[in-house]
Amino acid sequence: MKDKFELVSKYSPQGDQPRAIEQLVAGLKKGLKHQTLLGATGTGKTFTVSNVIQEVNKPTLVMAHNKTLAGQLYSEFKEFFPNNAVEYFVSYYDYYQPEAYVPQSDTYIEKDASINDEIDKLRHSATAALFERRDVIIIASVSCIYGLGSPVEYGEMLVSLRVGMEISRDQLLRKLVDIQYDRNDIDFQRGRFRVRGDVVEIFPASRDEHCMRIEFFGDEIERIREVDALTGEIIGDREHVSIFPASHFVTRPDIMKKAIVNIKAELEDRLKVLRAENKLLEAQRLEQRTNYDIEMMEEMGYCSGIENYSRHLSLRPAGVTPYTLLDYFPDDFQIVIDESHVTMPQIRGMFNGDQARKQMLVDHGFRLPSALDNRPLRLEEFEKHINQIMFISATPGPYELEKNPDVIEQIIRPTGLLDPIVEIRPIQGQIDDLMDEINDRVEKNERVLITTLTKKMSEDLTNYLKEAGVKVQYLHSEVKTLERIEIIRDLRLGVYDVIVGINLLREGIDLPEVSLVAILDADKEGFLRSERSLIQTMGRAARNENGRVIMYADKMTDSMRNSISETERRRKIQIEYNEKHGITPKTIRKEIRGIIAATSAADEREAIKQHDLSKMSKKERDIFIEGMEHEMKEAAKALDFERAAELRDALLEIKAEG
C-alpha cells in the first residue's frame, strides 16, 4: 500500500509561504482541531496546503463550494501530486430536478436527472482509492455530505481475485451481478462484464479505458490481465485485482431480505396512520409505489430511487446520522475547507432545505418517513467527523474565527504582485468612463471584469457594450457549469475582452489576464457589496501587475471603507517586502488548460491538433482514429450531434491528409 505523499514542483515556498506552512504543520502536530489560513488572492494557498499535506502525510478531503472551483483545485493538486491518488468527488448530475410535491396545485414532480458518466467514474475511483491506499487527496464539492451507501457493505462486497484462486466461472458471474455489474457481450463499457468461453472480461466502474481479463482453467483463475478496452492491447499481467461495486448503494442479499421485511413493516404502520387521518388517496398511492419498489429490489437487487430506503439497507435506526463520503476515510484524515467563508454557510444550510422538500413528499403519500433519513449531514454531525480541519479564505467568516481566532496570515505573493490600487469614481457618467477604461485595457491585451447588482443591469450593459463593438459576455446563474468554465477560458484566450456578472466572479477563479475590476453601485449596502464580498471581488485584479479596481459610488459606506483599508494594509506589507528583497512585481501567465474531461471546454479540433499524427506509426494512427470514431458514435448515441459533427469533420481532415 502506497502511503507517502510526494510533492512535485519546480518552485520552493516563497514570501509568506514558509512561515504559513511551518505554523499549520506545527498546529496539526500539536493536535489543534481548527486552524485558519487567511491567504490573500494569488499568494499560492493551494501550494501552501500541498506542502502541509506532504509534511503531515494523512489522507485529505479538500472541500470547495462549487464544481467549477473543485475542478480547478483538482487540476492543481493533480499537478502537484502526479504520483499519488488525487481524486474528484462532486455531484454526478449534469441536470437535476429533485422529486417534489406542490399541494396547492396538486402537482407531483418526478425526479428527473441526467447523470454525467465521467463524473460517476471519478466518484467510484475516489471511494476505491480510499480502500486501497493512504496517499489520497479527494477534491469534493459540498455534495460529499449527502447520504451515500455504507462503506462497510461497499468494502465487504468488493470482489478480490488472485491468480491461482479457486472459484468457478459461474460463481464469479454471480458475484458480479450481486455488486450490480451487468452482463453485456456487445456494448462493453463501465460497470459491465462479458463472457467468452473460459474468459471473463470485467470493466471496473472506476475506469474508462482499461478492463480486466480473467482467464480460467477449470475452476481456477489461471491468469489476470489488464487490457485496453478499445483496442484489446495487453497492458500487463496482474497477480491480484479488486473489483469494487458498480453502485455505492450496494447491499448483500441477506441484508436486502432483512431490509425488505423492515420496509414492509414501516409501510404497514404508515398506512394505518394515513387511513386513521382519512388520507385514503395518500395511503393507496404510498402502498402502490412502495410495493412496486419492493418487487424491483427482490427481483433486481435495486430500484429507482433506492437511496430513499438507505436507512433500511444499512439496518440503521430512525434519525441516525447517514453514511457519507466522510465515513469512507480512515479516522485520522484531515479536512481542508477552501473559500471557507462561503463553504461553511453552505454546509450549515443544506439540511433544512432538503428536509422541507422531503417532508411534503412524506405527508402526501409519495414516500415513507424513512426517506427523511436519506439526507445531508447537519452542521453538528459534520463537526463530529472532524479530526483536524483547516479553513482557507482571503476573508474568513464568523464560524472560522469563533473556532480559532488565531489566524495564520499569508499576504505576500511569491510573484511580488501587489493588491490592486482602488479608486472611487462618481456614478454620474460611469458607463462612458467605463468604455474609456475598457478600450485602454483592450489595447494592452488585458481583460476586464464588471460586476453589477441586478440581472437586468447586467443584460443591458452587455447589450450596450456589444453594440459599441466590445467583445463581451454575460455570465449569469443560468449558465451551466461547463459553459461557465468555457466562458472563463475564452476570456483568458481573448475570445472575449470583458465579462459582466453579478455574484459569479468572486471566489477562486484564477485570471492573470484581468487588470481591471469595475464595481458598479459599490455604495449599495447588501450581501453583494459587504466588506467580505468587496475584498473577494477586488482580489480578481490581484494577479496582474497593472491590477486596478474602480468602485463607482456617490457615498462611502462602512463596507467600502473597511475593504479599502484592508486592501491598503496588505498592499503596504507587500510593498515593504518587495523593497526589502528587491522584487519587481511581474504577472505570471499560467497555462490555459482544461480542468477535467467532464468539465473541459477545449475545442475538439484544437485538442486533435495537439496530437502530431505525422510522428505516429501506422498502428498508433489507426488506434487514434478508431478511438475518435468510437467517441463520435458515443456522442451521436447521446444525441450530442454538435460534438459528433465536430469529430466527424476532424476525422475527414485527418483521413484526407493521408
From Swiss-Prot:
Cellular location(s): Cytoplasm
Family: Belongs to the UvrB family.
Chain ranges of the Helicase C-terminal domain: 430-592
Task performed by this protein: The UvrABC repair system catalyzes the recognition and processing of DNA lesions. A damage recognition complex composed of 2 UvrA and 2 UvrB subunits scans DNA for abnormalities. Upon binding of the UvrA(2)B(2) complex to a putative damaged site, the DNA wraps around one UvrB monomer. DNA wrap is dependent on ATP binding by UvrB and probably causes local melting of the DNA helix, facilitating insertion of UvrB beta-hairpin between the DNA strands. Then UvrB probes one DNA strand for the presence of a lesion.
Transmembrane segments: none
Gene Ontology molecular function terms on file: ATP binding; ATP hydrolysis activity; DNA binding; excinuclease ABC activity
Protein name: UvrABC system protein B
Lineage: superkingdom: Bacteria
Entries under PANTHER family matching the protein: UVRABC SYSTEM PROTEIN B
Stretches assigned to the Helicase ATP-binding domain: 26-414
Species the sequence originates in: Listeria innocua serovar 6a (strain ATCC BAA-680 / CLIP 11262)
